[in-house]
């Protein structure tokens, strides 16, 4: 799972942050964990940041390290909870580009997001919730083009797509 707050350990480098879970949970050896961390950082466009500490990374880079850390565990489904909400607007696209690439590679993603253009473009199924209640479920293009509930109609009318 990837959260809106990156939750990187500040005393560990990007590579060490990615390596930690596979070493502790999967009991992977140092050399294999380092190779895997390098591969995952490369996958999110941060191969050159292996030895960088979180304080030296932008918010978007920190979020991509968090994504690499999650991917290192070989999940069947990647859960993303508002992963762009804590980012400066100019950094959002770099994170969304990584998620879009993962989706195109067949990764199953469950995302909580307010990035409606992204949800419409990349999603295969959208669940619209309002005040903790599911109001509509379906194809994103259909839901945005023809919302059935008053809540979704109001929401679609209030956001720019």
Q: Which ranges hold each PLM region?
A:
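C-terminal boundary and immediately downstream tail of ABC-type ATPase nucleotide-binding domains
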Residues: 128-131, 137, 141-161
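ABC family nucleotide-binding domain
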Residues: 1-140
């Amino acid at each position: 799972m990837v959260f809106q707050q990156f939750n990187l350990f500040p005393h560990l480098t990007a590579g060490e942050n990615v390596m930690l879970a596979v070493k502790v949970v999967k009991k992977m050896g140092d050399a294999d964990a380092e190779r895997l961390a390098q591969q995952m950082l490369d996958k999110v466009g941060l191969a050159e940041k292996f030895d960088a500490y979180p304080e030296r990374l932008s918010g978007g880079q920190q979020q991509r390290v968090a994504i690499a850390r999650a991917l290192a565990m070989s999940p069947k489904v990647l859960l993303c909870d508002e992963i762009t909400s804590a980012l400066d607007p100019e950094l959002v696209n770099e994170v969304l580009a990584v998620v879009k690439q993962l989706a195109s590679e067949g990764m199953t993603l469950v995302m909580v997001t307010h990035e409606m253009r992204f949800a419409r473009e990349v999603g295969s199924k959208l669940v619209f919730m309002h005040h903790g209640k599911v109001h509509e479920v379906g194809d994103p293009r259909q839901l945005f083009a023809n919302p059935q509930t008053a809540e979704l109609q109001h929401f679609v009318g209030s956001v720019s797509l």
